[in-house]
Each structure stands twice: as structure tokens, then as C-alpha cells.
Amino acid sequence: MINFLTLSEVLQILENQVRNYGGAYGVRDMHLLSSAVYMPESSFGGNYLHETIPAMAAAYAYHLCQNHPFIDGNKRAALASSLVFLDLNGYEFECDDDVLYEKIMDVAKGEVKKEELIKFYEKYSRER
């Protein structure tokens, strides 16, 4: 069984990021937030559109970052949500912090397509 994140959990992740690193807490657009949070569990014909746990984690990172649903902390919440999702599903993510930072910044700038981010997550994610 896959442990998907709920809206409430993503909001808790944002709150934690803002509390620890600063910024303003709040949702700019609840519809964009809902869209991003539920994207990883989207399916068609009984099959998930994102077929692997790392691909689903990448979908959290990509859509939360691109949808920009929060007042502040979008990149931090996107990254943290993806890593929490991996952890909840028995995966670890091992990547140099600088490489990860650059990748998330590139996603935010629109320079990385979702397929590329999925490959990135598949490269650095391992089952525990």
C-alpha cells in the first residue's frame, strides 16, 4: 500500500519549514495546492500515471513547486514533501545537498521538465 500525503500533512510540512527557516505561512491558492497534492496518486484505467515511488515523489516536488500554492516557502515545502513521501514509503534519498538545491531551483525557474525530475529522483532514491 502506498502512503500518499494528505493536504493536512503538506500544510504541516510547510508550517515546519516556515517555523524553522523563516517566511510567511499561508496558502495563496487552495485549488492549486489540492491539484499538486493529489497529482502523484492520479490514475487512469487502474494504473498510476506516476508508476514508481520515486516518480510519485518527483511529482510532489514538481507540482508543488510549479503550482506555487503557498504565500512563501514553495520550494522548501515541495522538496520536503517529496522527501517525507519517500521516507513514508520505505525509501531514502541520497544526493549532495548542492546538487539537490540546484535541481529544485531549476524546477522553480521552469528549466526542468517533470520527466527529467523523475529520472533525477529515480537515480538518487533507494529502497531501505
Please place each PLM-identified region on the residue numbering.
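FIC/Doc superfamily catalytic core
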Residues: 1-128
